[in-house]
Amino acid sequence: MEETGLVPVIQIDSAEDAVPLAKALLAGGVDIAEVTFRTEAAEESIQRITSECPKMTVFAGTVLTLEQAKKALHAGAKAIVSPGYDDQIVDWCMKKNATVIPGVSTASEVQHAVKKGLSVLKFFPAEACGGIKFLNAIRGPFAKVRFMPTGGISEENFTAYAKLKNVIAVSGSWLCTKENIGLKEWDKITEACKKSQREFPRS
């Protein structure tokens, strides 16, 4: 995740689009994606990508229930990502030695996650909850925690987030919008990935 630095958040309405989308991302130099459980096609999409595109690392996103977490891991997801912090999901994933990246937006939630032994967290919704100012402020007391900011991250501001020392990767939908996927604009997605990779600040 840190090497790529970009985690596209994708919403797939038809599992038929999963593999072409994954190939478009890979062609653009992005080998990781967060497939959200916002549609009925999520589980099958994860299965198809992990089966047919082994170079793509798939995270399951918008995981709200333990049942979704179980389905996601069974489908081949390498990590469970949730918009908020859910003890049941976190505890179950940790018992299964499965990577879990819960969402946080306050210092109290970060401290709770650290107490559980987590060091990589999703900061959501980033822009609405203080954005870069929050991440700079939280770095003092939680120097070992790395964040994946999501929510309001765009082509215009992702580089500012990526420059922060406590950001492991930036996440958003600007690389492949719902419209891009619906219209099967695979070339546009590839070009968006290449452009963002060129602009990504490498240390």
Residue ranges and their predicted role:
Residues 21, 65-75, 108-116, 153-169:
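Catalytic cores of alpha/beta
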Residues 93-98, 179-203:
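C-terminal helical cap(s) of enzyme catalytic domains, especially alpha/beta-barrels
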Residues 9-11, 31-39, 56-64, 69, ...:
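Catalytic beta/alpha-barrel core
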Residues 26-31, 52-56, 73-80, 94-101, ...:
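Glycine-enriched alpha-helix->loop->beta-strand junction motifs that scaffold or abut catalytic
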Residues 26, 30-53, 174-184:
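Glycine-rich, proline-tolerant flexible connector loops at the mouths of alpha/beta enzymes
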Residues 1-11, 20:
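N-terminal amphipathic alpha-helix/helix-capping segment at the start of soluble metabolic enzymes
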Residues 83-89, 122-132, 166-188:
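Glycine-rich phosphate-binding active-site loops on the catalytic face of alpha/beta enzymes
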Residues 8, 25, 72, 121, ...:
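Conserved, mostly hydrophobic/aromatic
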